[in-house]
Each structure stands twice: as structure tokens, then as C-alpha cells.
Amino acid sequence: MHKLFAVRSLSSAIVKSFKSLQNQQAAFSTSLLLDDTQKQFKESVAKFAQENIAPYAEKIDRTNSFPKEINLWKLMGDFNLHGITAPEEYGGLNLGYLYHCIALEEISRASGAVAVSYGVQSNVCINQLVRNGTPDQKQKYLPKLISGDHIGALAMSEPNAGSDVVSMKCRADRVDGGYVLNGNKMWCTNGPVANTLIVYAKTDTTAGSKGITAFIIEKEMPGFSTAQKLDKLGMRGSDTCELVFENCFVPNENVLGQEGKGVYVLMSGLDLERLVLAAGPVGIMQACMDIVIPYVRQREQFGRPIGEFQLIQGKLADMYTALQSSRSYVYAVAKDCDNGKIDPKDCSGTILLAAERATQVALQAIQCLGGNGYINEYPTGRLLRDAKMYEIAAGTSEIRRLVIGRELFKHQ
């Protein structure tokens, strides 16, 4: 009983520390990275996320579901978070990728699961429509997605086509007035709850990468269905499933981009997807620091706080430099993208660095908490499970290394 009380007392101290965000942020200065307006935006999103998302993070993970008592999608829409890169005429903020990274970082700090679903909605779906949609498509789909009334998703991977996306088997056969889709898509984030999905299928099975087309799918389309929700290791509550297409008719006006140009739509968006999602592991690393710093101040061994020991201070230093270097890289590349300089190797580099560092920082957070880090009274285990996803999703760490190496070799 005494040990349980001690655990809960320390856990309570950590919860209280979340309420002093300004003090925490002072220890992680962004003065060299952000201007005053960007800092105010970061503080505003941090306050929103800690008040409206963080209190549900443990329950979301435990139940593998968003809370029923609050509509987080609509709440984020009311706070103008979904359309950060979208034009104002559709309800967006038109602020750019740096602001988008800042928002995703702070949401991830509150809940990794909510952040990855938010990233798919705001970047992978909405931003792809902004970049590639026709005026009619934008007018039809963007306002409801940006407001949070509708949820978006994207599907390219299949049970037997992951990194080798060009080997996809999902087909789109031409018919009068449109196409008929048949096949399956796998690991679709937001799939079970999405109203609007961007889906890639082969319109010409003999043309290789030039035979793939992107389509806008609506959940009500006959022949489209979702399979059972997947039970994941981490990012639990971020609904993920398999998509099934059985003679699903898609009209011509729902082609995104042009027929045969799906790989261009995919790859041009993938660079920006990797950049924005790289802010997710940055937020997870910050969440680790939010837990560890108050813990090592409260936890005593040998008559003094364990944070006074050099071994612990060394761990804190390693965690801090991993966080700040990753954050600086993400912000710098986001600024370049806002200036029209989209570099595949740096977009891949941001998420390669941040994802692998986040896994290591989460492991160190568990180590700093010792036995408490290994029990579910503390969120460190959840943070580790969530962090690992970023080494796999949006292209694995191995694929990111290939992209970087190929770009470096090509330019030489």
C-alpha cells in the first residue's frame, strides 16, 4: 500500500507539472527558431492541447478509441487547426508548413494518437486536396474537412505492397462516366471513421509507375467498405483498418490530378507528409521531458533527489539535445518549404532523425523512472509505443535512408 501511494504521489506531481507549461517551455527555448507571432501560436496550441486533449490521452490508449463524451475532430476544427495550410476561402488559415509542424508537435505532446490522426486529416488529406484538387473538388470537400465536420484519410499501401507501392494490385477499370475500383488497401489511418479518402489505384497495369491514378472516395459510395479496426501496438485510438473495394464506381470528377499521374500526386505530397509528421516525434520527446524532469526532482534515493546524480543529468542532457536538434531541423526544413524549397532528402531527414531519436528518448524516460517507468500508472510506456510508429509509417527509416543516399549520389 505504501509503495502504491508513493507511485500515485509522484504521478500526481507529474500531472501538476503539465499545468505550468510556461515554466516548462522556458527550459526549452525556441527563441532562436521562432518569431514572436510563431511563439504565440505555439503557446496557444499548447494550451488548447493540454486542456482539451491531454486529459483523455490515457483513456484513448486504454480503450483504443477517441472519447465519446467530446468531439475532438470538431473541437480542433473550431480552433482552426485542420486547415493551417489551406486557403482562407475554404476556411483555412493559409499559414504554411512551419505553423503546421508547430501545431502537430503540441498535439503530439498531449497525445500521440490524436496527433497522428490529426496529421493524416490536415496534411495527408486536406493538403493533398489543396495542392492537387480542381476548384470544384476543393469547394466540395475542403470546407467540411477543415471545420472538422468530416474526417479525411489516405490509402496507398496494400497487404502485399508497402514500400514497393508501385506493385499495388488495386485496379480502377474505365467505364462510362468513370471507373470501377476493385481491391484492398491496408493500414489506413482514420479509415474506419473517414468521410473523404484519397485512394491510389492502377488504371493501366502495363504502365508501371505511370499507370497509377489518385481518386477521391466518399464513404457512401456503393462497393466501398471498411474491414475490422486493427489492434495496434501504439497510436491506439487512432483508428486504422483495411479498405475493401468491390465494384466501387467512382465518377470522372473524382479523379485527383490526372489519370496516370497518381505517383506524382503521391510523391510530391509524401515529402511534405514526412516533414509535417516529423513534428510528431518531436512532441513525444517533449512529453518525455515533461514527465522526467519533475520526476527526478521529486524522486529521492540515498537521501536526495535523483536528479542531482550525474548519471541522471547525463541522461537529461542526451534527451534534451536529441529533442532540440530534431526540433531545429524540422523547423528549418519547414521554413525552406514555406519558401518553395522542397528537398526530398531533408524532408526524409527530418523524420528519420526525429523518429529514431524519439524512440531512444522514450526508452531513456523509462530508464529514468526505473520501476515506475515500466508500469502503466505512468505514460512512458505509451510514449515508447507511440514513438516507434514513426520509424515505420510514411516510409520506414530504411526507405528514408535510401531517399537521402540516392539524392546525395544524384547531386554529386
Curated annotation (Swiss-Prot):
Residues that coordinate or bind FAD: 154-163, 187-189, 299, 310, 367-371, 396-398
Q: List the disulfide bonds.
A: none
User: Where the protein is mainly located, per its record?
Assistant: mitochondrion
- Keywords, ordered alphabetically: FAD, Flavoprotein, Mitochondrion, Oxidoreductase, Transit peptide
EC main group: oxidoreductase
Classify the source by domain of life: Eukaryota
Q: Where along the chain is the active site annotated?
A: E273 (proton acceptor)
Instruction: Please give the Gene3D superfamilies that the UniProt record associates with this protein.
Output: Acyl-CoA dehydrogenase/oxidase, N-terminal domain, Butyryl-CoA Dehydrogenase, subunit A, domain 2, Butyryl-CoA Dehydrogenase, subunit A, domain 3
Interval spanned by the transit peptide: 1-25
Please list the reactions this protein catalyses: 2-methylbutanoyl-CoA + oxidized [electron-transfer flavoprotein] + H(+) = (2E)-2-methylbut-2-enoyl-CoA + reduced [electron-transfer flavoprotein]
Q: Where in the cell is it found?
A: Mitochondrion
UniProt EC number:
1.3.8.5
User: Which InterPro entries does this one have?
Assistant: Acyl-CoA_DH_CS (IPR006089), Acyl-CoA_Oxase/DH_mid-dom (IPR006091), Acyl-CoA_Oxase/DH_mid-dom_sf (IPR046373), AcylCo_DH-like_C (IPR036250), AcylCo_DH/oxidase_C (IPR009075), AcylCoA_DH/ox_N (IPR013786), AcylCoA_DH/ox_N_sf (IPR037069), AcylCoA_DH/oxidase_NM_dom_sf (IPR009100)
Entry comment describing in which tissues the protein is expressed: Expressed in flowers.
Cofactor(s) demanded: FAD
> GO terms for CC?
mitochondrion
Amino-acid positions noted as binding substrate in the UniProt annotation, renumbered to this chain: S163, S209, K210, Y264, D271, L272, E273, R274, A394, G395
Please name the GO terms of the biological process aspect recorded for this protein, alphabetically.
2-methylbut-2-enoyl-CoA(4-) metabolic process; 2-methylbutanoyl-CoA(4-) catabolic process; L-leucine catabolic process
Q: What Pfam families does this protein map onto?
A: Acyl-CoA_dh_1 (PF00441), Acyl-CoA_dh_M (PF02770), Acyl-CoA_dh_N (PF02771)
Give the family this protein belongs to, as stated in its UniProt record.
Answer: Belongs to the acyl-CoA dehydrogenase family.
Q: What is its quaternary makeup?
A: Homotetramer.
How is this protein named in the record? 2-methylacyl-CoA dehydrogenase, mitochondrial
* Source organism of the structure: Solanum tuberosum
Its encoding gene is what? Answer: 2MBCD
